[in-house]
Amino acid sequence: MAKENLECSFCGRKKPETNLLIAGLDAHICDRCIEQAHGIVAEESRQSKKDDLNAELILKKPKEIKAFLDTFVIGQERTKKVLSVAVYNHYKRLLQPHSKEDDVEIQKSNIVMVGQTGTGKTLMAKTISRMLNVPLAIVDATVLTEAGYVGEDVESILTRLLQAADYSLEKAEKGIVFIDELDKIARKSDNPSITRDVSGEGVQQGLLKLLEGTVVNVPPKGGRKHPDQKFIEVNTENILFVAGGAFDGIERIITKRLNMQAIGYSASMREETLDETNVLQYIIPKDLKEFGLIPEIIGRLPVLTHMNPLDKKTLRAILTEPKNAIIKQYEKLFAMDDITFKITEQALDYIVDKAVEYKLGARGLRSLCEAVFTDAMFELPSSEEKEFKVTKPYAEDKLSYETIKKLKAVS
């Protein structure tokens, strides 16, 4: 066939009418048809990815979510229930097809958890992420500063979420962000100051747009922003934000409020109704405002819950009962070297007693166990011994006063 008579096998255009005509074995295709085909493939691919994401995101009912949390988190029954409902409502909202006729807009159920260090706030977020198969970014609020100052700006949060999602934008936009130590960005004072609070109220203002839902330009691969750079547009509307913090001293704010409310009531009535051993259970949004969070942030974290302090019984259960309990992990580690690991009840109680005495929390249990077992994990793999039994005297010998003091300093 003469070159002048060549034509596109799809649209029939002659070669002179095209910018480019590509030949195959028995057919030809022009540049316009290639462009059109590319658009069709891209749209099909986008829809396929969306369907895949919805298929991957297995949404369970609130009771099923709580049951999953129960296998990893000991205690905190009320918080697990509140979290299960909030997470269920959030992802139920995402999976619901949008209709233009539907004028009821369901807002996000962002969450704030208040509780002492080591009570399980981060573990809750990690467990939810694992169950739903969605990416999770854990961010320390203490390193955040206002844009333009030394430190990480709030948009770096989304960079971390993209990294957790392997730079899949679709996955990232359905992910979870856990902001740890939210209390550390509380407003330092109600009084105006000449010195700018770049790591406090300024960061809170920066977080607002992320929490409420907006499109943010994020530098790819965590790079610095510069004018010629291509950005990734991330829509935060469907990202679930979970914030946590110890809020040291908020108990005094709660107690003061409760004492003011108790005026006019008899002391006996107040004693019957208030549990002074766990004041956090009475927390309300007003207390967060008094602590130093701005009202706008509080309004965008509508689900408020608390973590109960860990008593001796709960800490004991954390050591042995969860699916990934600390003692079970050490059993598995020793088993990899064909060593049978055993620990007496008295030794377990001693480790728990030290965690309570020095207020190390659940996180401190791991550090205490590591201090007790390290020498054995160093020596036994090179020896002929096939059993390692930890008794109370052995634990006492390994947990000297100096060792515990060091652990307390870093906890």
Language model: regions and residue ranges:
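AAA+ P-loop NTPase nucleotide-binding core of proteostasis motors
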Residues: 2-33, 38-137, 141-150, 155-411
